[in-house]
Regions:
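Carbohydrate-associated surface elements
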Residues: 14, 136, 158
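Nucleotide-activated donor-binding/catalytic signature segment of Leloir-type glycosyltransferases, i.e.
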Residues: 223-241
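Short alpha-helical donor nucleotide-sugar binding micro-motif in glycosyltransferases
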Residues: 240-241, 248-253
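Short hydrophobic beta-strand element within catalytic cores of glycosyltransferases
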Residues: 278-282
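Conserved acidic donor-binding segment of nucleotide-sugar-dependent glycosyltransferases
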Residues: 293, 298-305, 314-320
């Protein structure tokens, strides 16, 4: 959006490795310290409400400059976004990347999930326009928060494909029987389905190996499952892997798997495709929308480890299938998920919000 000549300012929380006021590719980024960092981690909603006090105070560093639209990303910044909306008399646009109801399979447990769901509901009510990243999420947000369908807009996520491109043309030659997956290690990400699929392939593909990168609250349970199923020699939990190391890993991999049980969009699918890795995804949420009918990847029913194993075997044992998927994926990324196209669509939502 900055490349198109628009002034963009981002409010965020501070990080020890970055400054509190800097320009990044034409975008001014202001960062605030958390207001009450001593609050226990299980007081998540209170911690975020506290941090929003500091986010709101960042407005004082803008001087006389004022935006025309406020854009909030998820419930985490709902308080500051709504306060600035009232203070400046501006329209509010809210992007909902995922919902607590969706993460819990359509049910909202008591406690923190119920509190977050309430903030999500309030944010979408206060916003003039709402953005969701897939048709699946448009339905979930519209129905779950009882919104007018005219208020909810589809704007897909995107990536900078140049950050993931291989220095050499990708092909199946020299690729290992290696399966790579990465992301937050949470139950809904379905990594437990992948480990079962790898075990199912032990005798069919004796040289198969799998690396799962990432951190999360489900990590200990996933390691326990790996130990109990006796696939520790096949599956490695690598923890956090920096992007440059992940890109090197993707140059060797035979395929990327995104086995999510719930996935509003699935940015990792685009990253895998951009790196030239044949990509297999669960037929769920936004993941299915990315791949369905494009030939850019293979699909399996979420939770079905046997179906996933068959997809992995198909890609690893048929180089022509893998190469065809790469070609289709490159075309898909170039036509649908560029930042310029996404910025133009987002600008249209801003104008809609300004019109009321």
């Amino acid at each position: 959006m900055a490349r198109a000549g628009h002034d963009v300012v981002v409010f965020s929380l501070n990080h020890p490795k970055v400054g509190d006021d800097e320009m990044m590719e034409g975008v001014r980024v202001l960062r605030a310290n958390a207001d009450m960092p001593w609050l226990p981690d299980d007081y998540l909603v209170s911690k975020m409400a506290s941090a929003n006090h500091q986010l709101t105070q960042l407005a004082a560093r803008l001087g006389t400059w004022r935006p025309q639209v406020i854009h909030a990303h998820d419930w985490l910044v709902a308080w500051s976004a709504d306060t600035l909306k009232a203070l400046w008399g501006l329209p509010l646009v809210a992007t909902i990347h995922g919902t607590e109801r969706g993460r819990h399979g359509g049910y909202v447990p008591q406690g923190t999930p119920a509190a977050i769901n309430a903030v999500e509901w309030w944010l979408t009510f206060q916003a003039q326009q709402v953005i969701a990243c897939s048709k699946f999420m448009v339905r979930e947000v519209t129905d779950g928060f009882e919104l007018d369908s005219q208020k909810v807009n589809l704007v897909p996520n995107g990536i900078d494909t140049g950050q993931w491109h291989s220095p050499t043309p990708p092909s199946s030659n020299g690729r290992e029987p290696l399966v790579v997956a990465w992301g937050r290690i949470q139950y809904e990400k379905g990594f437990q389905v992948l480990t079962r699929a790898i075990g199912h392939l032990r005798h069919r593909l004796p040289e198969i190996r799998c690396v799962i990168a990432g951190r999360g609250t489900y990590l200990a349970e996933l390691q326990t499952q790996i130990d109990m199923e006796g696939v520790g020699d096949l599956v490695q939990l690598a923890g956090f892997v920096p992007d440059d190391e992940l890109r090197q890993l993707l140059q060797r991999t035979g395929c990327v798997v995104i086995p999510s049980l719930y996935e509003p969009f699935g940015i990792v699918a685009l990253e895998g495709m951009a790196a030239g890795a044949p990509t297999i995804v669960a037929r769920t949420g936004g993941l299915a929308e990315i791949v369905e009918g494009t030939g850019a990847g293979e699909l399996f029913e979420p939770g079905n480890h046997v179906a996933l194993a068959n997809c992995i075997a198909d890609v690893l044992t048929h180089p022509e299938v893998a190469d065809r998927m790469r070609t289709k994926a490159a075309s898909l990324l170039a036509g649908r998920y560029t930042w310029d196209a996404i910025a133009a669509t987002t600008l249209g939502v801003y104008n809609k919000a300004k019109r009321g």
